[in-house]
């Protein structure tokens, strides 16, 4: 049985576990009008979990009785800014619980988007985003919630509109691309930090136009690049319409509060924004396979002859850099290699990283050959800030080095009970999430 578990900060019910109390252990999430400890019937995959300050969105894939797939958007937590849609906010004001996941109804067809479905999601502090796709048409990016720092990406118009909308459509037709090809736009990725968002746009190959990297939101620290032709001019506090970021061959992005990190197809990285905490001082120059950002830190997963290595730099106020020599001083820039108690073999092991506000989760899967059989040994690690119990270890003590929280190794005593396998990990603002295959009898 597929189950979503959560732990950590929960003042507004953002863990979706039917309480408003912080949780120090991973507990099953609840979906309204469905049996406890289970996802909605027909769920075949949990595609994504994103969270802001106090709200959470999950993207589910479901299969109906005819075998047809569809996606649904569910949310919980604080929706007062409209970050979970107009109906969710109205129902919450009327007394509906924010501590259970509710299906997010946005009436796409009534708003001029018939045939579209949810494909990607993202969230900043009090704003949510979804990428909609429809066969034969270009992708559409929608936003909902707070617009204090241009978060909605619509030019600040939300503050002067008198009528409330279910959502807003982020436009890209003001960019230097022919208007005739916007039906061929495909969104490869959408990533949000605390107050800024970056989208990777792929234009139809027949148009012979290279991919575009665009962003909006807070920009004071240069996290969205140089926005003026004058090199000595200061970036504006924020921009409220998507602007092109002059970087090429970007395959993924990761965003903190005041900085942005980019992974290029070459396996190299680049970065924009503040380096006040040393968050731009990552040392690997090649073979980077994945990146991540905490609020004031940067992380790079590197494939080396010695195995997987995770390089970290930036704030280390809660041990979130995972360094063996561990000066807990947020004001002294730090960088180094995360110290795991065992080698992660890059030849037989895959690795996944999730960065929260100031804590990190890692899931490794090792294919071990025994005689004629191959056994997959999975290990789930966590370290860093743990004030709200967001590492799920049953306490609120910060963890300075990677701690093995769960493994399917024989004889391992786990913090997670009754879990057969982990299929996904996510981290937020003092929150952590895991999707797992769960024993039915627990």
Predicted segments, located by residue:
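Short, well-ordered alpha-helix to beta-strand connector turns
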Residues: 250, 286-288
């Amino acid at each position: 049985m597929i189950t979503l578990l959560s732990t950590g900060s929960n003042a507004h019910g953002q863990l979706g576990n039917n309480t408003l109390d912080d949780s120090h252990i991973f507990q099953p999430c609840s979906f309204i009008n469905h049996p406890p400890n289970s996802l909605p019937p027909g769920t075949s995959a949990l595609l994504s979990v994103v969270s802001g300050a106090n709200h959470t969105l999950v993207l589910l894939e479901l299969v109906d009785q005819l075998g047809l797939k569809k996606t649904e958007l569910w949310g919980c937590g604080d929706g007062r800014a409209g970050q979970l849609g107009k109906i969710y906010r109205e129902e919450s004001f009327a007394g509906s619980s924010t501590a259970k996941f509710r299906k997010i109804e946005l009436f796409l067809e009534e708003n001029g988007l018939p045939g579209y479905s949810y494909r990607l999601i993202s969230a900043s502090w009090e704003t949510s985003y979804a990428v909609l796709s429809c066969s034969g048409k270009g992708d559409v990016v929608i936003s909902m919630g707070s617009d204090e720092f241009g978060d909605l990406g619509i030019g600040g118009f939300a503050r002067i509109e008198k009528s409330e909308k279910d959502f807003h459509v982020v436009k890209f037709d003001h960019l230097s691309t022919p208007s005739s090809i916007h039906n061929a736009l495909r969104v490869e990725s959408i990533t949000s930090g605390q107050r800024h968002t970056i989208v990777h746009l792929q234009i139809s190959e027949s148009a012979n136009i290279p991919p575009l990297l665009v962003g909006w939101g807070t920009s004071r620290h240069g996290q969205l690049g140089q926005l003026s032709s004058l090199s000595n001019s200061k970036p504006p506090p924020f921009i409220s319409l998507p602007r092109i970021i002059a970087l090429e061959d970007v395959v993924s992005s990761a965003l903190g509060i005041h900085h942005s990190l980019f992974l290029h197809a070459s396996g190299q990285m680049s970065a924009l924004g503040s380096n006040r905490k040393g968050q731009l001082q990552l040392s690997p120059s090649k073979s980077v396979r994945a990146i991540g950002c905490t609020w004031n830190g940067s992380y790079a997963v590197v494939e080396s002859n010695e195995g997987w290595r995770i390089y970290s730099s930036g704030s280390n106020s809660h041990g979130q850099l995972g360094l063996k020599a561990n000066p807990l001083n947020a004001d002294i820039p730090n960088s180094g290699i995360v110290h795991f108690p065992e080698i992660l073999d890059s030849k037989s092991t895959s690795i996944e990283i999730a960065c929260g506000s100031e804590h990190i989760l890692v899931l490794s899967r090792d294919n071990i050959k025994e005689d004629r059989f191959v056994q997959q040994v999975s290990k789930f690690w966590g370290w860093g800030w743990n004030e709200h119990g967001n590492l799920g270890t049953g306490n609120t003590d910060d963890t300075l080095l990677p701690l093995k929280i769960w493994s399917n190794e024989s004889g391992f005593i786990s913090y997670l009970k009754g879990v057969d396998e982990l299929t996904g990990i996510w981290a937020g603002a003092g929150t952590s999430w895991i999707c797992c295959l769960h024993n039915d009898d627990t």
